[in-house]
Design a protein with these regions (language model features):
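Repeated scaffold domains used in trafficking and secretory/extracellular systems
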Residues: 10-22, 60, 66-70, 114-125, ...
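Short loop/turn segments that connect beta-strands within beta-propeller blades
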Residues: 1, 38-42, 99-103, 166-169, ...
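Loop/turn-rich, solvent-exposed surfaces of beta-rich toroidal or solenoidal domains
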Residues: 81-87, 120-239
Length: 271
């Protein structure tokens, strides 16, 4: 077996997952977005590198200094015309949409204006639409040893999602809505029934009081057209049910398997 690699610049590392499509493999490092393809001998090569604003430090609710995004391929025809990620700019994060073919940045759009400037999640991408979720201030039980200090050290978890649409002529992007959904998992779009599904987290007394070990967790369905919550159903309580911003898997029939800090939940939505 032959193993080949591409060296990153000094001080740059991969802290998130990667994404693959027929157009190549997308990698977000702590400094930039890369698209990797292969040369005539099958060795990996960098097609392009797109820098983003990594900010001045790791933020609370993120696990590394830099973008927390696994890059997302999306598009209206092939599903791979665009790539997207969320940067780590200090005071206001932005959603970047890049042409997969050329690496040209089509837009750098402010997002998550109500929930805090940070996201550790991979954005949803479908058609010309991207949906991002805030994890700013999320109380992870631990962070990687090499994560570095967060600035500030802690912050309240408010949550929130933003929908951004790429214009048909690729001249830019527009924000369609922003909500205050307190997503505790990586939101997923169910194209079969046209809903965003996730797990939400709520303080048992009042969300304004912040997160607590006694928080309750709910299966939630969100309307991608408006950002409104369609339903919430209690599925657990206390940090034993915390999905810590991990991604669930949807099985045939709509059943969701969601990991938590203590195991796996099987969630069958009520009809």
């Amino acid at each position: 077996r032959k193993v080949t690699s591409v060296a990153l610049p000094d001080g740059e590392r991969v802290a998130n997952s990667i994404a693959t499509a027929p157009q190549g493999t997308a990698v977000v490092t702590t400094h930039a977005l890369y698209l990797l393809t292969e040369d005539s001998t099958g060795n990996p090569v960098v097609k392009y590198r797109v820098r983003y604003d990594r900010g001045s430090a790791r933020k609370p609710g993120q696990l590394s200094w830099g973008s927390g995004s696994t890059p997302t391929f999306f598009g209206p025809v092939t599903g791979g015309e665009y790539l997207t990620l969320i940067d780590n700019a200090d005071n206001q994060v932005h959603l970047l949409v890049v042409s997969t073919a050329s690496g040209a940045v089509l837009c750098t759009t402010p997002v998550l204006t109500s929930g805090g400037p940070g996201s550790e999640n991979s954005p949803i991408g479908a058609g010309r639409t991207v949906i991002a979720a805030s994890t700013y201030g999320y109380p992870y039980p631990a962070v990687p040893d090499d994560a570095g200090p967060a600035v500030p050290a802690t912050a309240p978890f408010i949550g929130g999602m933003t929908r951004v649409d790429v214009r048909p002529d690729n001249s830019g992007c527009d924000v369609a809505w922003t909500n205050t959904v307190r997503s505790a998992a990586v939101p997923k779009l169910s194209v079969a029934d046209g809903t965003i599904v996730t797990v939400t987290r709520h303080n048992p007394v009042n969300d304004q009081l912040g997160t607590t070990p006694a928080d309750k967790f709910f299966y939630a369905a969100v309307d991608p057209g408006t950002g409104a919550v369609l339903t919430e159903q209690l599925i657990g309580a206390t940090t034993a049910s915390d999905p810590i911003q991990t991604a669930g898997t949807t099985a045939p029939g709509g059943t969701i398997y969601q990991g938590t800090v203590t195991g796996i939940q099987r969630i069958t939505p009520l009809t």
